[in-house]
Regions:
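Anion (oxyanion) recognition and catalysis
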Residues: 54, 138, 466
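Alpha-helical recognition segments enriched in aromatics with Gly/Pro capping
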Residues: 1-32, 47, 107, 127-341
Length: 484
């Protein structure tokens, strides 16, 4: 398998430190608000990576943090604590909103078939680890105390910028409009390891430390949690491209200064989800949630497919038209799977080998999910029996997680029920001698599209059936079809 490594700016063969266990770390959400679908794009792609590693035989231990303290409204060290700001907004305690939005995040993940990491660690649960690391960084000259805070001294590093080749003056540290810069730093890019009450008098969460009562900075959290659960030799660190600088840059600086050797072999960054007005952002108040997609009639897995149709290293443009197209593609794909006959035939091992090779060629080349989706259509078109096709679709879906077999079974059940007119149930009636599972599945898909107010997709299915010589007549509670 080859994976693009953001730290070296090239695709590299994936060779873990220890093949018996791949150690993978994911930057989790700051739980002061709902995750928007741009955030969730990153988690979808990281989910595919983990599942593909397992698919090709690697055991994986994946750890994710939950930031419930220390992440300021600027990605640098300025502004308000996001958790405190969220608590004030909703008139709740910090821990109340942390629990609420953590639960909401994992509910969104469930709807998108994103596997829960093996270990999920709230940042507030590892204070002792942060203090231990900071103490050593001070003792070894990599950190200093200034006006109530402990800072990492970036001037002590031979190389600070890892994920880009820009000069220092070309990079913005992420100080947003209306946010004052921290004048306690010795150097522009120094960052806080520990805040004391000198920063925010009304900070809700504080702990005793050698430097006074306070709380950890954002960056030290991921270092402490990763080292605690995954040790000093990390294989893969994932996150959105927003995290590359300064967050991941600072993680590397403090982690390698603490352990005294290289820390993580591969860095994976997922690019932005953009709208017509630019990058989706909670700070601008412009964001869409999974719940909103559902309210508009979309299956969340349509959004998962939408993400899979684009490479993770390309910015993806969200429009409702683009999502409609993905929803139509998803419904058609399920209809094709539903038309396959689960007759228990023998598996064609030669076809399995050929088609798996195509699937692996796609995902093994820097996680090309677009080609992996194409591999599903290769299965459907391949000249082999339905049992083999169903086996392969189920096999590939262990990685893509589109619920193809489950959704197809639901379509078949609805189609079977529709053949028996019942009050309140959508019925599909065929002229005598014209029963056809594929036609029934397509008519059912047309009904689902109409129910979701995706009328363009419903019309497309009607036109497609008409071109095949199938005439549909809508009737109360269902539809009747015949060949013409």
């Amino acid at each position: 398998m080859y994976l693009y490594n953001s730290a070296t700016h090239k695709k590299e063969e994936f060779i873990p430190n220890d093949p018996s266990l791949v150690k993978m770390y994911t930057c989790g959400p700051t739980v002061y608000h709902y995750a928007h679908i741009g955030n969730l794009r990153s988690y979808i792609m990281e989910d595919v990576l983990e599942k593909y590693l397992r698919y090709v035989g690697y055991p994986v231990k994946r750890v994710m943090n939950i930031t419930d303290v220390g992440h300021l409204t600027s990605d640098a060290d300025e502004g308000d604590d996001k958790m405190l700001k969220g608590a004030k907004r909703e008139h709740k305690t910090v821990m109340e909103i942390a629990k609420f939005y953590t639960d909401a995040f994992f509910e969104d993940c469930r709807k998108l078939n994103i596997k829960r990491p093996d270990i999920v660690q709230p940042a507030t649960g590892c204070i002792d680890e942060y203090i231990k690391i900071i103490t050593k960084l001070i003792d070894t000259g990599y950190a200093y105390f200034s006006n109530g805070n402990v800072y990492f001294d970036t001037s002590k590093l031979d190389k600070y910028y890892i994920f880009n080749e820009h000069k220092e003056e070309d990079l913005a540290v992420g100080v947003r409009e209306g946010v004052e810069e921290d004048t306690n730093k010795r150097n522009k890019n120094d960052f806080v390891l520990w805040f004391t009450k000198s920063k925010f008098e009304d900070q809700a969460l504080k702990w005793d430390s050698p430097w006074g009562t306070g709380y950890p900075g954002w960056h030290i959290e991921c270092t402490g949690i990763s080292l605690k659960y995954l040790g000093e030799n990390l294989d893969i660190h994932c996150g959105g491209i927003d995290n590359a600088f300064p967050h991941h840059t600072n993680e590397i600086a403090q982690s390698e200064s603490y352990i005294g050797h290289p820390w993580c072999k591969y860095w994976m960054h997922v690019m932005h989800l953009n709208t017509a007005s630019g990058k989706m952002s909670k700070s601008k108040g412009e964001f869409l949630t999974v719940s909103l997609l559902e309210e508009k009639g979309y299956d969340p897995l349509c959004y998962r497919l939408f993400c899979l149709q684009s490479h993770y290293r390309r910015n993806l443009v969200f429009t409702w038209e683009n999502l409609d197209n993905a929803a139509g593609t998803y419904q058609k794909l399920i209809a094709k799977v539903a038309a396959l006959k689960n007759d228990g035939g023998e598996i064609d091992n030669e076809a399995v080998a050929t088609l798996r090779e195509r699937f692996n060629a796609a995902l093994g080349n820097d996680l090309n999910t677009s080609l992996a989706v194409t591999a599903l259509y290769d299965v459907l078109k391949y000249k082999t029996n339905d049992a083999t096709k169903l086996f392969l679709l189920d096999d590939f879906d262990k990685v893509l997680s589109l619920d193809l077999i489950k959704k197809a079974d639901e379509v078949r059940k609805r189609a079977a029920a529709a053949a028996k007119p019942t009050a309140g149930v959508y019925s599909i009636l065929a002229e005598e001698g014209s029963e056809d599972a594929e036609v029934t599945a397509k008519i059912q898909a047309r009904y689902e599209a109409k129910k979701a107010k995706n009328f363009a997709e419903a019309d497309r299915i009607r036109d497609e059936l008409k071109a095949q010589g199938i005439e549909i007549t809508d009737i109360p509670g269902g539809a009747r079809w015949k060949r013409i």
